[in-house]
Amino acid sequence: MAESFKTGLRRPRNIARVSDLHARAADFLARQARLLEQRLYATLFEGASAAGVVEALRGYQNEDGGFGHGLEPDKRCPASQPLDVQVALETLVAAGTSDAAMLQRACDHLAAVGPDGGVPCVLPSIAAYPRADHWGDGDFPPGLNPTAAIAGLLHALGVDHPWVDTATDFCWRELDREVPHDAHGLAVTFGFLEHVPDRQRAEALAGPAAAQLPEAEWYLADADAEGYGLTPLAFAPTPDSRWRQLFDDAQIEAHLDRLERDQQADGGWPVTWEPPSEASRLEWRGIVTLGALRTLTAYGRLR
């Protein structure tokens, strides 16, 4: 990355304005966010121990070792869901912490759900509970999404469990068959390729995967685009992200400008899809607001 680019990112145009942006976002999190996002904010921005994040996550872990209870808020189902395991792992990585017993139990659960390595995003158990329309009846096949994300995160956390190897083999088989053509599939693939131990194989697939992104479904290359999708900042949330090189400086700057503009009057950021309830919407807004703060701070737009 060019030094001039790094310098430019770390000189906010209006420090008073962006500091106010942060203060209003922090107020929104204090008023509206879940305990989990509040504890993660305290860890990332206030120097609090990551132990608080782990303790908040425990409330979502079930006796079977999986995570549920709407940890991913688009379904209000208490039963364990693979996608909720992914969110738990993402939270631990974000907090820079781990919990061996929690992770071993989660892997035991994943092995029971996907003994051949692959798991679906959600299970049919969600059908008995309120959920976003895109989850339908919860009948999904095992796939790269979310298996690749989960496997990559477990590698990032250094988890040693037989299922991690089984899931890794599943992901390689799927990627050898076909590289995803949608933004969600590419996002989880990138996460897997970033952390999987076989670096030679990962680097060989990085180029073909990256080549799919410009035309991928649900990818929003244009910072002025409206509606739901993943922007370049979803793939490169920090300047030193592995996939930052896929985007030019002007594109990143434009999306950072848009991210700043999208803050709402109440201090939070909006969601661009329809959650199953107002409670779910607020939970999601806490998640995306914290994500916006993390990205804007990483790129030098906030302090």
What is each of the regions a protein language model found here?
Residues 2-303:
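Preference for long, amphipathic alpha-helical scaffolds in soluble/luminal domains
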